[in-house]
Amino acid sequence: MSKAKSEFNRRAIPEVARETHWIAPDGWRIRRIDWDLRDDSGAGATKPRGSLLFLPGRGDHYEKYLETLQHFADTGWRVTAIDWRGQGGSGRLLPDAHVGHIDDFSTWIADLGAFWVEWKSNNPAPHVIVAHSMGGHLAMRALVEEAVDPQAVALSAPMLGISTQGLPYAAHHAVARILGALGDPTRAAWKEGEKPMSPLNVRGKIL
């Protein structure tokens, strides 16, 4: 392992990266991080290979991928990553900050499409998307809906669907709609005593 890799601090934002917010058309603040190869004067210190947009997964935040993103930057890419609306540093959609929620995936597609237009105009080609898990699903959907037009896409474990145990998707959709109507679709899927996982305070110490 190289000295640079062995000394990488996974718990700190690299000094060469900057965190800001992009304002969506409806005013929502989307957190972003950028590795810009230009020097302080704005001149191009190093001509980039191109521009890379990283899209994280469900419940993710870009801090989980800092070492990978730094690697992309070290190999010559101008790198940007975002936190999806409602997770990470992009606010919450419900009063309970520990409950993930979105009204419809189309909201995320709209955010991505609007962000893409601005990001693409401010960064040199080729424009590449790298996406993980749910980010991979949203990247594929955005491509199909022509919300983005990258020159290349790389997907890591993309969320292609949900296992239905052999039952038709339509049946699962119907059950989900019925349960949502009978209960509260915005509450946590598991009550505190039902969660098949460690308590939140214990999980926090692992990260």
State what each model feature region is.
Residues 2-44:
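N-terminal cap/lid segment of alpha/beta-hydrolase-fold proteins
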Residues 45-47, 119-125, 148:
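Glycine-rich phosphate-binding loop signature in dinucleotide/nucleotide-binding domains
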Residues 100-120:
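Alpha/beta-hydrolase active-site loop
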Residues 138-207:
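Alpha/beta-hydrolase-fold enzymes
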